[in-house]
Amino acid sequence: MTVHVQLEFTPNPDTLKYTVSRPLLERGAASFDDAAEAAPLSPLAARLLGIQGVTAVMIGRDFVTLTVSDPTVMGDVHAVVLRDLPAWLDGGTEVVTSVWADRDHAGDYDDVAQQVIEILDAQIRPAVARDGGDIVFDRLDEGVVYLRMKGSCAGCPSSLATLKQGIEARLRQTIPEVLEVRAV
């Protein structure tokens, strides 16, 4: 079956989001910003990071988001992705290796942190994934939730508004112990 790739625009002008016609990951997202570090975990991400101008790759369930360092090379990056990504996926390039897939994705969290993670996973992450991004729980410290912005969320002009008006408001409404949300 030939994999089809389609560009979708995101609120972040520095990213390109490509939806693909087959699942890439069963759950979560894989983010990389160094080809050498990505190679043992995601051969696909390593190849994408090898494209001139690509500085970060995030792989989601059925999409890939690329962060591009220089807007003047966006067209070149797009042409390479449209040409090579379907061929790589059809040719069997591994999306993530068993080393990445077997990592422990769950931490040992207290009840409040677990509530935060459940809301993020059920309500927030699916919404930001539609724009090619991801928001990952980092830690909870004295009522402050620290989150990592990935993919098109990283560096997006509207990410602070999303963080404060959307995520912080939702978490504070549901979990009284949450006082603030910050990006790391």
Q: Model-flagged regions — what are they?
A:
Residues 1-184:
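Domain-level signature for proteins that mediate thiol-based redox and metal-cofactor handling
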